[in-house]
């Protein structure tokens, strides 16, 4: 079972109406049985509808989807979108994490996680949750630390230990420095395995930053992970794209992992 998190820069109608870009996005996403797409800027779900039409071009049931409401503290909103193959997994439940009072200024996240619980008959772990996060870069340390609270909430709500937390955490370079990791519970607690190392480069730009991460908790989920399968997918190299074309698709690579 192949899972990925992909921050597709400004994913919306403009990008999906470009035949070249949309065909590469579909080609990338078809690698996966579950894909989280972040930075979905699509208030009326027009781009999401087009994406699903394209993914299901050959078979109307290749992919289904779950999408969050538009999330954000001001007029700038993003959605979390999951596309998945229903012949491999099914959605058991979803909920929007409540991170506090936005208007009071004491909420924990710019885009609070929209959590999904999947059933997966073909893997060792039969049910697991995915917690998505696209952090606000300037608050990355605090937001990644707050994912620990989301983990506890999911664990309690669904009586579930097998939880994957993933997305563009902005977890490197100037946003999270080496001295700050010690203040991040998601990192210091032995409950969690960080599958994408700090040395990884998840950016399609000239920077070398491990912004995008996959973190797993729960013994069944951790034992289902195929050893070295957690890597960024460098679509530029894989498809022989120019820098310009790669960046037109996104400034991030997907991060992926395989479960058995």
Swiss-Prot record:
Catalytic function, reaction form: Endonucleolytic cleavage to 5'-phosphodinucleotide and 5'-phosphooligonucleotide end-products
Organism, as annotated: Ovis aries
A GO BP entry: neutrophil activation involved in immune response
Compartmental location: Secreted; Zymogen granule; Nucleus envelope
Name this protein carries in UniProt: Deoxyribonuclease-1
UniProt gene name: DNASE1
Alphabetized CDD domains for the sequence: DNase1
Glycosylation sites: 18
GO cellular component: extracellular region; nuclear envelope; zymogen granule
